[in-house]
Amino acid sequence: AILSNGDNITLTRVVELFETEQVVRPFERQIVRNETLPEGETRLVQAGVNGLEEITFRRILEDEVEISKSAVKTVVLIDALPEIVMVGAQASYTPLNIPGTLAYLAGGNAWIMENSTANRRIIVSTGDLDGRIFSLSPNGEYLIFTRKSNKPADEEINTLWAVRTRNLDPKLISLEASNVVHFAEWIPNTNSVAYSTVEPRSAAPGWQANNDLYRVSITGGTPRKLLSTSSGGVYGWWGMSFSYSPNGKLAYARPDQIGLVDQDAGYLKPLLDITPLNTHSDWAWIPPLVWGADNESLFFVSHAPAPAPITSEESPYFDLTAISFSSEATVALVQSAGMFSSPSVSAIRSTGREKIFQVAYLQSIFIEQSDTSRYRLMVMDRDGSNSKLLFPPADSNGIEPQTPAWAPQALEGQTGDFIAVVYQGNLWLIDSGNGDAYQVTGDGLLSEIDWK
C-alpha cells in the first residue's frame, strides 16, 4: 500500500508460543458379568488408576492478548488403568445332571461342567482365547485351544495350547504351533493332536492357507508332517478342514472337494467334487463335514445347482448329504438346509441287534440367504427320516451358525440325548427325544462349546 500524508500506521506485535501441560487422564469403569457370583453381588477385581498425558499447545498472542490456543501434540506419559467390577449374574436355573465333560468358552476363558450344570470350574483364565480352536479329547481329559498372539496380526495370528481338564490346578501346555485357523483335533486312541496352519498376511482375510497337516504329541517332541503344503484347489488361499472318525480315519473338506487322507503315505484321495461357492468377497465356503458314529458314513453339506440363469458357482442352495461306504451310495438327505447346516452325530445306541445313531443339523430360516440367515436346530435319523424341529420354536429368533454338541451318552430315564447349543450368548441343553429345552447360563458371554 502507498501511504499518503496524514495516514496512520498501527503495529501489532504477534508472538507464537509453545507450552506443555500435564493433564490427568481419568480411568474408565468396566463391568464384567460373572455367573460364579450371586445375582446383584459386586466385587472389585481391579482398582482404577488415573493416567497422565502431556499436551503441547500452540498459543498466538497479539499485543500480549491471546487470540488462539490449540493442541498440536499429545503424549501419553502413564496409561490409565481401568476399574474392573465383577457383577454377579448367577441366575436360578435348575441344575441338570449331565454325562461326561462339557467345556465352554466365555469371555476369553475356558470353563468346564462335570456331572451337573451346577458344578462349574474355570480351567483357563488368561482371557485371550480366540475361539478358532476349542476341542476336547475323545475322553474329555484334555482341551486344546488357541490363544491370541501378542505379536502383530501380520506376523502371528494365534498359538495352540492344551490343558488337562481334571487337574484342580491346571497347567497350560504349549504345543509349539502357531497360526492355526481352521483345524486342530485330537487323534482318536492316541496322545497326539493334528493341526493345519496358515501364513499371516496384512491383506484380507489376514492369511494365506498352507493346506498342510501336522501331528504333535501332547508329551512334546518334534511335529511330524502328515500333509505337505499345497495350493488347496479352487479358493485354496482360504484353507481346508478335516474330520476324524471315531476309529481314526481322516476325511478332508475344501471349497471344491471332499475326500479321505492317507495318513501314512501323505496324500489326498478325492471322493466327491463340490461346486465352489463364489462369495464375491474375501472369504470362501468350506463344506461342513462329520463322520457317522459307525465309521462307515460321512455327512456333509453339498452345493446344489440353481435354475438358469443363476450360475452353479453362485447358487444359493445347499443340501445336507451323506456318503455310505458300506453301500457305496451318495444321497441328499435334506434339500436346501443351508450352507452352515453343520451336521453333528450322536453316540451309537443299540436297539436289539441294530446299532443306530441320530444326526443333528441346522436348518436355515431364509433358504436363499443362508450365508446371513439364522438357523433352527433339527434332528433326524441317520437315513434322513423322522426329521423334526427341536429349537428354538418357530416364533422365536433363530440361532447363529455353529456345530451342535451331543452329550456323549444318554442319562437314565431320558427320552433322547442332550444336545448343547449357544443361543443369544448362553448355553442351552435340548433333549433330542421330547424337545424340552433348558437354559443353563445367563451372562450372555458364551461363544464356543464342546462335549465329550
Protein language model features and the residues they cover:
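Extracellular modular ligand-binding repeats in secreted and cell-surface proteins
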Residues: 1-94
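Sequence signature of WD/YWTD-type beta-propeller architectures
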Residues: 89-452
